[in-house]
Amino acid sequence: MDEVICDNRCMHTNVFLEGDQPEEACGVFGVYSNEPDFEASFLTYIGLYALQHRGQESAGMVVSDGSHVLAHKNMGLVSNVFNRDILEQLKGRIGIGHVRYSTTGSSLLANAQPLMARCSKGILSVAHNGNLVNPEELRQDLQENGSVFQSTTDTEVIINLIARHSQDDLPTAILKTAEVLRGSFSLVLMTKDTLIGLRDPHGNRPLCLGKLADAYIISSESCAFSSIGARFIRDIAPGELIMIDREGLRSFYLPKAKAEALCVFEYIYFARPDSNIDGINVHLSRKAMGRELAKQFTGKADVVIPVPDTGRSTAIGFAESSGIPYDIGLIKNPYIGRTFIQPQQNMRDLGVRIKLNPVEEVLKDKRVVIIDDTIVRGTTSGKIIRLLREAGAKEVHMCVSAPPITHPCYYGIDTSVRKELIASAHSVEEIRNYIQADSLTYLTIEGLYRALKPKEQLCMACFNGDYPIPVPGEKGNKYQLEEG
């Protein structure tokens, strides 16, 4: 038997809150060992836990013992999808895993990953972080040539393109596929005896390589290595394909070099603070953003507080630079999932109080600087400011560690509709008035560059409209493969 799909249909619904944060597409993880008794499923499970912040709609993994392929995926958090009994059934020395937030295709079990397909190379499994901007034309061409699709995700387009190159060896087939893909993609792929990692030629999404004894690990973020006791080796380069099998590790490269364009939101919001991405620690980068914000802030205040959790590092940097004391003024309910993960609006309108609670003794009669990472729609910001005033804050000054988001993202962030972006149609003063802050300070693009790295190495299209990967008609629709 080549394949067993374990799938208990135990559906789980997460109720999260309306938010002002953009949301990430996915997290991917892979592990390879030559040891026959290696427990790839347990390591993949822990790795996915470490990447849970990158997606909470579904989780899944595929493992192989070198001969047989086993898989399990379902809707919900990693802890809801897997248990000890399931993991013990998933025996293998090679594995890949995925946590998902939908940016192309609905939040459905059919779109949960990894996706699997039987082709000339055996069973091929793929997990994808990113978003294609040309999936419709690729899918139409595949359908005209006989491909039948079971999902509405762009990942199935990728796996069908690879399968079409049946005469080529696996790395060549994947590289040929990558040459026609337009958009953002960090992939982990698996056959019954091989693990592969591929990062798109712009390096728009992170992907890194680690090692645990003699086992190789591939992950969206380096924080997953620490969780399993592995050591970080290096970031996978833009346009690089890494193949791991019994012969060891080999690298292949896409033929045409592209300008590096890592998504700046990996540093601002998406990545865990203990991750390092392309040589920069996320926590330290956010502290640097806070120092730059403090230089711009012209008001006076008694206390600096973060919106938990991603505002914390920035608030520390702001406080250190400004001399204004740092404190905790909002407590986050640890049993409420990350803001904005569930994409349907009716799940966002439950209000902010169940998630955040003010510490009145810190706020009463104080001039408060509150640090947040982004303002997308402006909805939650206003509610938080109202919450602080009700707790006794005398003044509330909002400082944001990202510039105004004025343009949609088509590369894997769920902000592809321009009219949803408050800064696309309103001035800073209009937004300040809308959220009822005493002042509103956005970090400038120049300040963001100073905090991070040269502008030539970052994608900031959502701030300046400079799209490094051309977008056909500059039109985004996460349900584009469900229409027609």
Q: Residue spans of the language-model regions?
A:
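Flexible loop/turn segments at secondary-structure boundaries
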Residues: 103-104, 134, 204-205, 225-226, ...
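Secondary-structure transition/capping motifs at alpha-helix termini
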Residues: 147, 167-168, 298-302, 320-327, ...
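Generic beta-strand/beta-sheet core signal
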Residues: 127, 190, 198-199, 210, ...
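A conserved beta-strand->alpha-helix junction
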Residues: 151, 156-159, 326-337, 434-452
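Conserved short alpha-helical segments that host acidic/polar catalytic motifs at enzyme active sites
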Residues: 2-238, 243-301, 307, 395
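PRPP-dependent phosphoribosyltransferase catalytic core
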Residues: 178, 193-194, 229-235, 386-484
